[in-house]
Curated annotation (Swiss-Prot):
Pfam families: Alpha-amylase, Alpha-amylase_C, CBM_48, GlgB_N. GO terms for biological process: glycogen biosynthetic process. The keyword Ribonucleoprotein does not apply. It comes from Rhodopseudomonas palustris (strain BisA53). It is an enzyme of class 2 (transferase). This is 1,4-alpha-glucan branching enzyme GlgB.
C-alpha cells in the first residue's frame, strides 16, 4: 500500500465519499489519463482500452483500491480483474456521464418534474454503447448512498453513488439487468448506517417478507387497451364493484389467484352482473396482508403477491376488453414505519413530518406525509400520473381524505399543531389535493378521481378554479350511515326515523356523490350488509333486496363491495375466499339476480343516471307517509318522458289502492319489483302496468311488502 494516499482515497475504501466520481474512474492529470478503481477481493486489475492495449493498475490500498495510467490515453476502457483463478472483464461505472441532465435537476429542484418515474428509480439504459441500469434516488441529507444488489454481492463498497443537485444520488451500473434485486445502503449525515432501504420508485418488488426492489424491463409490460370513452362522466352510468384481489376467490388450497387467473374470471363475472367499473383495493406493494394494502411501501410497484407487473397489466387489459373501467384505491395520506420503507429514509424525516404531533397517525400507527415539502408533493403527484399512464387505469379513489384535511384529526386537545392562521385545516394538504386533481384532469381528462371524505368539508368535488378540491366525485358517507341505520331497524321502529331517508336529499346535489357500500361496512364487528337486516329469513332477504333497489334509485353513482352482490352472510375476511357456495341457495341467487337486473336497468335507463348529480333529476312525490314506511319519488333524464317512478315500502305490509300522482296520464309499466318471485319474493305487484287517470294523473298501485318498485311511462 502506498503511504501517501489523499483523504479521498481513504473516504472511498471506508465507504464515506459523497462523490466517488471525483476520485474513481478516469481523470486527466499532467496531460495523462489516470484511472482508479475500487474492486474489493480482486487480486490484480488491468485497464484494457478500446484498441486492446493493456496497462496493469497498481494496488494502492490493501482494501482493493487500484490506480494506473490508461494505455494510449484513451477515455474508453474496460477493467480486467482477476478474482482467484477467474478473470473477468468489467465496465467501470465511474467512467460514464451523468444520468440526470441539468434541466432535470432544475425541474426536480423546483418540484415541477411531472414524470419522476422516467428519471428516478432503476431504468434500463445504454450509455456510451454499454447496456446497464441507471439508479437515481432522493436522499438530500445522506452522507453516502450505495446501490447494493445481485450485481455486486450486496457489497456497499463496490457501488457508492454520487450526489447531484439538491440531493439526488445517481449511478449507472453496467451489465446490471432486468430482474436484478437491489436496495440502497444509506449513511446518515451523522454517520449512522441505516437499515437497507427499498427503492421508493421501484417498479417491481419482492414478495413479503422479503423487501428488495427489482429492476423492471418496461418493454415487457404491455400497455393495456383503453376503456370505453366517457365511462366515468357525470352523465354516464357508474356502478362500481369493489374488490380485494386476495380474497375474491381462492384456490382449493386457499392460495391466491394470480393476476392472470383473475383476468380470466373477474372481468367476465363483473360484466355479467352489469357493473360498469371495478375498483381494486390498493395493489401497491405492502408488507402486511392485514392492512389490505392501505399501508403501502412500494407506491410504484403492483404487489408481487399475485404476479408480475406484466400480469397486472394483463388484468387491466382484460377489464377494458369487457368494457369495464378500472379504478384504484390510492393512499397518499400515510405510510407505514417499516425500516425498509420511507420512514427516516436518509436519516431524517424526509417524507414525513419530524414532529409526531404532525407526522404520526395515532389510530393506525403510521406516518403522515409532509405536504409542505416540494419533493414529497412531486413524488405523490407523479405516482398518481404513473398509474394512469403506464397501466391505463381510469381513475383513483383517494383514501382517508379527512385525515389529510384536518390537523386535529383523531387527536386530543393539545395533541396537534395549528396552521399559521391558528386553524385546524391542513393548508399544505389542501394545496396538494388541488394540485393532484389539477394535474390528473389536465393530462387525463377522461379519467376521474373520488374522495373518501367523511366530514362536511365543502366543495370536495367542485373545480379548483371555483375554490374546490377538484375531485370528480365524493363518497357519500352520510347517506351510507343514515340509510344503513334505518334499514337495520325493525320496521315497527322505522317510522320514528323517517327523516334518515329524507335527510340525504337535502345535500344530495351539493357534491358529485358516489353511494358507497364499501369494504369498511362489512368488517370490525359491523356484520355483513345482510347480517344487519332485521326479521326472519324471508324478511332479511326482502329488506336487503329493497335496500339495494333503493340505492340504485337514489341520486348518485353506485359502489358495492364484493360479496354484497349475493348476500354474503358473514363479515369479510381478507384471509379467505368469499362464500361462493351460498349461491347454491335460492335466496342468495335471488339477491344476485336483483343486483344484475338493477345494474342493467341503471345502465339502460337515462332517468336513473343522466342527472345523478343534478337536482333537476329528482322530485319527491311521497315524503309524509312515515306511519306506513312508504316513500315515493321521480327520477328524471334529459328527455321529456325520461321518467322513472320509484315506490319504496319499508314495512312488511301490503298496501292496496295506494294513490300516487305522476307527471303523465296513460299507462305506466312496472319495470322492476324487488318482491318478484324471480328474486325469492312474495310476487305481489301490479301485473305489469297501471293506468294513470284524473285531471291530475294518479296511479292506484299495489305496494308489495319490504319492497321497491320502478314504473316508467309508456311511449
Amino acid at each position: 500500500m502506498i503511504a501517501t494516499l489523499p483523504d479521498e482515497a481513504y473516504a472511498i475504501v471506508e465507504g464515506r465519499h459523497a462523490d466517488p466520481f471525483r476520485y474513481l474512474g478516469p481523470h486527466r492529470e499532467n496531460e495523462r489519463t489516470v484511472v482508479r478503481a475500487f474492486l474489493p477481493e480482486a487480486a490484480s486489475v488491468e485497464a484494457v482500452d478500446e484498441k486492446g492495449g493493456t496497462a496493469a493498475l497498481e494496488r494502492i490500498h490493501d482494501a482493493g483500491l487500484f490506480a494506473g495510467l490508461l494505455p494510449n490515453g484513451s477515455a474508453r476502457y474496460q477493467l480486467r480483474a482477476r478474482f482467484g483463478d477467474t478473470i473477468v472483464d468489467l465496465e467501470d461505472p465511474y467512467r460514464f456521464p451523468p444520468i440526470l441532465t441539468d434541466f432535470d435537476l432544475y425541474l426536480l429542484g423546483e418540484g415541477s418534474h411531472q414524470r419522476l418515474y422516467d428519471k428516478l428509480g432503476a431504468h434500463l439504459m445504454t450509455l456510451d454503447g454499454v447496456e446497464g441500469v441507471g439508479f437515481v434516488v432522493l436522499a438530500p441529507n445522506a452522507r453516502r448512498v450505495s446501490v447494493v444488489g445481485d450485481f455486486n454481492f450486496w457489497d456497499s463498497r463496490r457501488h457508492p453513488m454520487r450526489v447531484r443537485g439538491s440531493g439526488y444520488w445517481e449511478l449507472f451500473i453496467p451489465r446490471a439487468t432486468a430482474g436484478d434485486h437491489y436496495k440502497f445502503e444509506i449513511v446518515s449525515a451523522q454517520g449512522h448506517l441505516l437499515p437497507l432501504k427499498s427503492d421508493p420508485m421501484a417498479f417491481a418488488a419482492e414478495m413479503r417478507p422479503s423487501t428488495a426492489s427489482i429492476v423492471l424491463d418496461p418493454e415487457r409490460v404491455p400497455h393495456p387497451r383503453p376503456a370505453p370513452a366517457g365511462i366515468s362522466a357525470l352523465t354516464s352510468p357508474m356502478s362500481i364493484y369493489e374488490v380485494h384481489l386476495g380474497s375474491w376467490r381462492r384456490k382449493d388450497n386457499n392460495d391466491w389467484l394470480s393476476y392472470r387467473e383473475l383476468a380470466e374470471q373477474l372481468p367476465a363475472y363483473v360484466r355479467d352482473l352489469g357493473f360498469t367499473h371495478v375498483e381494486f383495493l390498493p395493489i401497491n406493494e405492502h408488507p402486511f396482508d392485514g392492512s389490505w394494502g392501505y399501508q403501502p411501501t412500494g407506491l410504484f410497484a403492483p404487489t408481487s403477491r399475485f404476479g408480475t407487473p406484466e400480469d397486472f397489466a394483463a388484468l387491466v387489459d382484460a377489464c377494458h376488453a369487457h368494457g369495464l373501467g378500472v379504478l384504484l384505491d390510492w393512499v397518499p395520506g400515510h405510510f407505514p414505519d417499516d425500516p425498509h420503507g420511507l420512514a427516516h429514509f436518509d436519516g431524517t424525516s424526509l417524507y414525513e413530518h419530524a414532529n409526531p404531533l404532525q407526522g404520526r397517525h395515532n389510530d393506525w400507527g403510521t406516518l403522515i406525509y409532509n405536504y409542505g415539502r416540494t419533493e414529497v408533493v412531486n413524488f405523490l403527484v407523479s405516482n398518481a400520473l404513473f398509474w394512469l399512464e403506464r397501466y391505463a387505469v381510469d381513475g383513483l379513489r383517494v383514501d382517508a381524505v379527512a385525515s389529510m384535511l384536518y390537523l386535529d384529526y383523531s387527536r386530543p386537545a393539545g395533541g396537534w399543531i395549528p396552521n399559521k392562521y391558528g386553524g385546524r385545516e391542513n393548508l399544505e394538504a389542501i394545496d396538494f389535493l388541488r394540485r393532484f386533481n389539477t394535474e390528473v384532469f389536465a393530462k387525463f381528462p377522461n379519467a376521474t378521481t373520488a374522495a373518501e371524505e367523511s366530514t362536511a368539508w365543502p366543495q370536495v368535488s367542485q373545480p379548483v378554479e371555483f375554490g374546490g378540491l377538484g375531485f370528480g366525485y365524493k363518497w357519500n358517507m352520510g347517506w351510507m350511515h343514515d340509510t344503513l341505520n334505518y334499514i337495520s331497524m325493525d320496521p315497527i321502529y322505522r317510522k320514528y326515523h323517517h327523516g334518515q331517508i329524507l335527510f340525504g336529499l337535502h345535500y344530495a346535489f351539493s357534491e358529485n356523490f358516489i353511494l358507497p357500500l364499501s369494504h369498511d361496512e362489512v368488517v370490525h364487528g359491523k356484520r355483513s350488509i345482510l347480517g344487519r337486516m332485521p326479521g326472519d329469513h324471508w324478511q332479511r332477504f326482502a329488506n336487503l333486496r329493497a335496500y339495494y333497489a333503493f340505492m340504485f334509485a337514489h341520486p348518485g353513482k353506485k359502489l358495492m363491495f364484493m360479496g354484497c352482490e349475493f348476500g354474503q352472510d358473514r363479515e369479510w375476511n381478507h384471509d379467505s375466499s368469499l362464500d361462493w357456495h351460498l349461491l347454491e341457495q335460492e335466496s342468495h341467487r335471488g339477491v344476485q339476480s336483483v343486483v344484475r337486473d338493477l345494474n342493467n336497468l341503471y345502465r339502460t335507463m337515462p332517468a336513473l343516471y343522466e342527472l345523478d348529480c343534478d337536482s333537476f333529476g329528482f322530485e319527491w312525490i311521497v315524503t309524509d307517509d312515515g306511519d306506513r314506511n312508504v316513500f315515493a319519488w321521480i327520477r328524471k333524464g334529459n328527455a321529456a318522458r325520461a321518467r322513472c317512478l320509484v315506490i319504496a315500502n319499508f314495512s312488511p305490509n301490503v298496501y292496496y289502492d295506494y294513490q300516487v300522482r305522476v307527471p303523465f296520464p296513460g299507462k305506466w309499466r312496472e319495470v322492476f319489483n324487488s318482491d318478484s318471485a324471480h328474486y325469492g319474493g312474495s310476487n305481489v305487484g301490479n301485473i305489469g302496468e297501471v293506468e294513470a287517470v284524473g285531471l291530475v294523473p294518479e296511479l292506484s298501485l299495489t305496494i308489495p311488502p319490504l319492497a321497491v318498485i320502478f314504473l316508467t311511462p309508456e311511449d
